[in-house]
Amino acid sequence: MKDYLVKQVSEDGQLRAYAVNATQVVTEAQEKHDTWPTSSAAFGRTIVGTLLLSAAGLKGDTKMTVKVDGDGPVGKIVVDGNAQGTVKGYVTNPHVNLPSNEKNKIDVKAGVGTTGTLSVTKDLGLKEPFTGQVPLVSGELGEDFTYYLAKSEQTPSAVGVSVFVNEDSTIGVAGGFMIQILPGADDRLIDVLEARLQEMPLVSELLQQGMTPEGIITEIVGELPMKTLEELPVKYECDCSKERFAKALSSIAPQDLKQLIEEDHGAEATCRFCGKQYQFSEADLKAILAEQ
């Protein structure tokens, strides 16, 4: 099944719903960063959460950066997303593989940690980007995204993010959902949704059964009539370039650039988001120095 995200709204205007299959996106992230199972699950869940938040909160050329910074061995997770369904990211410690938890699942909570922060920075094209930050409440990440939306954006929501890692450390499936209650919604509807969410299987189990993002939303909302607003392809794509790294080098102090020229006779830059390497010759560095 292809990767895509669907946005829906109930016909009575009481709720918005988003669901995504991001299996190929998370697979590409896993392969680019050589992540081990615990890191893969934590990184993948953050990617899925970023896709959902970006779909709900961005338009046009706007962007966002999600940072999960817990006290677990995985370290910091950073994911950039945009309104077009494109993400890129990195994890500080990709090689974490902890023992399974008591449910015999990957122990994401132990990997991420339970003390730390989840922050979302939106670049909406204004003078200053907007950042909302909340403490981690779970470390499982779905609950942490839900808490962020309630506290930082005052939007009552339910977020589920799920990654299944195969025995050989490849990604089996990855996806998630986000349900947002709109102003004026009936309390009875909220009660019904909460009950259905309690009984619902994991998103990864539904995806393994071949369920589509639309099917995942139906699993949650039941017979409530919904209409689709948009179907958005999603992908992992890095926009790094040699020009961008040259710009970064041009911000280095002149004496440090001279040191690179005289001692190293060049420089190598590696993109944290995709691992691509860029070589700068002595002549390249001299040209950058001359433009300072």
UniProtKB/Swiss-Prot annotation:
One GO MF term on file is: unfolded protein binding
UniProt xrefs under InterPro entries? Heat_shock_Hsp33, Heat_shock_Hsp33_C, Heat_shock_Hsp33_N
**The keyword Repressor belongs to this UniProt entry's keyword annotation:** no
A UniProt-annotated Pfam family? HSP33
- List cellular component terms (GO): cytoplasm
Query: What are the annotated disulfide bridges?
Result: C238-C240, C271-C274
Query: What CDD domains does its record include?
Result: Hsp33
The protein's UniProt keywords, in alphabetical order, are: Chaperone, Cytoplasm, Disulfide bond, Redox-active center, Zinc
Q: Which GO terms describe its biological process?
A: protein refolding
- Organism domain of life: Bacteria
Free-text description of this protein's post-translational modifications in UniProt? Under oxidizing conditions two disulfide bonds are formed involving the reactive cysteines. Under reducing conditions zinc is bound to the reactive cysteines and the protein is inactive.
Question: Record keywords: Cytoplasm included?
Answer: yes
| Annotated compartments | Cytoplasm
Q: What does this protein do?
A: Redox regulated molecular chaperone. Protects both thermally unfolding and oxidatively damaged proteins from irreversible aggregation. Plays an important role in the bacterial defense system toward oxidative stress.
List the PANTHER family hit by this protein, alphabetically. Answer: 33 KDA CHAPERONIN
The family annotation for this protein states:
Belongs to the HSP33 family.
NCBIfam families, per the entry: PRK00114.1 (NF001033)
In Swiss-Prot or TrEMBL terms, this protein is called 33 kDa chaperonin
Gene symbol? Answer: hslO
